[in-house]
Amino acid sequence: MKVGIIGASGYTGGELLRLLVSHPDVRLELATSRSLAGKPVSSTHRHLTGFLDLKYENPVSEEIRERCDVVFVAVPHGTAMNYVPELLDGSTKVIDLSADYRLDTPVFENIYGIKHSDPRKAVYGLVELHPEAAREEFVANPGCFPTGANLAAAPLAAAGLIDIAVFDSKTGISGAGISPTETSHYPNIAENIIPYKLTAHRHRAEILQELTRLDGKLRNISFTPHVIPSIRGILTTAHLFTKEPLSTGDVQEIYEEFYRDKPFVRLPGGVPSLTAVRGSNFCDIGFEADKENNRVVVLSAIDNLVKGASGQAIQNMNLMFGLAETRGLWLPAAAP
């Protein structure tokens, strides 16, 4: 299949290129950047030197549709909605990595403060919870924090066992994007941990949306992120206060059954490690029951650029074209 990437110069675009260049069913057709048109893709993604000879382009949507079977849209929030309508005006399939189509339109407009110009529905592409992504024409790829949080809590939410859910996530600085910020500036983040948006992070809406879909009575959900001096990875600690006491054995049975036949979710035992998932599309989950307080502590570890973004987008692409979801993604982590 012929693949295009709109907004290929950023971290998620670069990760799409890294993973797709060795995908056995993919031909990389184009990579776009308005500011870098004409320059080699490897001039910004030097790790891809010798693996592809693409140059950045800035074609119109009609040309993109004619040249590509599927397009990944990896542009900032509020920008994707300018591309998607024209890209879908034909047979080309689209996977959007921004937040523009993840939420119901009124919720998106309230949280992001942007008037939506194309309020169409898209399948939310967390494959483990939405197998209907298969054979779809348009998928909204989930956010990185919601991926880790929702995979951590989904089995207990689906069982109707959660009373209160509190999520604490630690993320590497690549989650801030390729443009330097105060948080990602080395003197500020080195040997430091920076909490931010303590009660009103916009990804909470995605967590709430997905967990209430599994349990319509669940409303008490809190989320606080922290940036840590690591390049990649998100470690989420979910404090799930349950309606009844559970043993660790009970939790093990629930999670094993829920994630049966879900190849990218692993239950390795013990505490998950960011190094065990770095560069891979896996989500590792561990847990321990606190029966005294009717609490289950669940930990999830993902690579924010892979399972939290580009790898998950390719997982969706595979299903959209009738391929095994592991195609081109069944790779071990780059540890240590």
Curated annotation (Swiss-Prot):
Query: Where does the record say this protein resides?
Result: Cytoplasm
Query: Could you tell me the EC number(s) of this protein?
Result: 1.2.1.38
Broad class of enzyme this protein falls into = oxidoreductase
Report if keyword Cytoplasm is assigned.
Answer: yes
Q: Give the GO terms filed under biological process for this record.
A: L-arginine biosynthetic process
UniProt pathway annotation: Amino-acid biosynthesis; L-arginine biosynthesis; N(2)-acetyl-L-ornithine from L-glutamate: step 3/4
Q: Which residues form the active site?
A: 144
Q: What is its main location?
A: cytoplasm
Q: What does this protein do?
A: Catalyzes the NADPH-dependent reduction of N-acetyl-5-glutamyl phosphate to yield N-acetyl-L-glutamate 5-semialdehyde.
- The identity of this protein, by name, is N-acetyl-gamma-glutamyl-phosphate reductase
Name the gene that codes for it: argC
